[in-house]
Amino acid sequence: MGIIKYKPTTNGRRNMTSSDFAEITKTTPEKTLLESQSHTAGRNAHGHITVRHRGGGHKQYYRVIDFKRIKDDIKATVKSIEYDPNRTSNIALIQYPDGIKAYIIAPKGLEVGMIVESGVNADIKVGNALPLANIPDGTLIHNIELKPGKGGQLVRSAGTSAQLLGKEGKYAIVRLTSGETRMILLTCRATVGTVGNGQHELIKIGKAGRKRWMGIRPTVRGSVMNPNDHPHGGGEGKAPIGRPSPMSPWGKKTLGKKTRSSKARSEKLIIRHRKSR
């Protein structure tokens, strides 16, 4: 994948970059693996805003991804590498000998014509999915399950990978992209390799309108709002916050306030918390 830079024909174009989509081999998705999706603009069933700064954006079909990879000991052929508007990584269309097709997250190095499989007997090579118990220590992995059979939940974004550090009892010790080291059951599955499209982080949005295409609306500072809209609002001109600590829009302390409960059940599985950003 390469990065395209544009001539500064307009202010929005000046700093914009995009992918050249060199890895994409097919532009039309598999119709049998598409589902329609409706956008709620961040509202719940009562019409209340539960997630701010959402709304608009281009219509998209959802590509049904096989995160579980439970079709064991059957070799599948990679038919195409495709773009997915719903995620940062690319996806790969695979086909089994019985004609069934599925989408998987496309790892780095996966190409059309390669063979992938899943199960305890699968080889340790890019794109194969195995239980953590069958993966050697030191292997880079992605699409990791947290509960056996639930499907991969961790490490699915473009360019990310986790490393299997070792095994202890019924748990595997995995270091995640964030720097967090945690224990995961050995019966949980993961896919070998690093997620592809690693240069995605180098793309510069360039203009506000491109964010609107993604369904993201503007974010406004609390200090320029009215006092009935935000605790920082009101005052004459550029007024200070006027409180001992910065506040969230709902009046809770923020900027440094810890939000994770120390009593969370998963806390006992975390050996080392993620690195401070």
UniProtKB/Swiss-Prot annotation:
Pfam families: Ribosomal_L2, Ribosomal_L2_C
Span list, region Disordered: 220-277
UniProt keyword Ribosomal protein, yes or no: yes
Family annotation (InterPro entries): NA-bd_OB-fold, Rib_uL2_dom2, Ribosomal_uL2, Ribosomal_uL2_bac/org-type, Ribosomal_uL2_C, Ribosomal_uL2_CS, Ribosomal_uL2_dom3, Ribosomal_uL2_RNA-bd_dom
Listed GO CC annotations: large ribosomal subunit
Basic residues: compositionally biased ranges: 254-263
GO molecular function terms listed in the Swiss-Prot or TrEMBL record: rRNA binding; structural constituent of ribosome; transferase activity
Keywords: Ribonucleoprotein, Ribosomal protein, RNA-binding, rRNA-binding
Single Gene Ontology BP annotation: cytoplasmic translation
Highest taxon, organism lineage: Bacteria
Family (UniProt): Belongs to the universal ribosomal protein uL2 family.
Subunit structure: Part of the 50S ribosomal subunit. Forms a bridge to the 30S subunit in the 70S ribosome.
Cross-referenced PANTHER family: LARGE RIBOSOMAL SUBUNIT PROTEIN UL2M, RIBOSOMAL PROTEIN L2
Function description: One of the primary rRNA binding proteins. Required for association of the 30S and 50S subunits to form the 70S ribosome, for tRNA binding and peptide bond formation. It has been suggested to have peptidyltransferase activity; this is somewhat controversial. Makes several contacts with the 16S rRNA in the 70S ribosome.
Protein name per its UniProtKB record: Large ribosomal subunit protein uL2
Organism classification: Bacteria, Bacillati, Bacillota, Bacilli, Lactobacillales
This protein's encoding gene: rplB
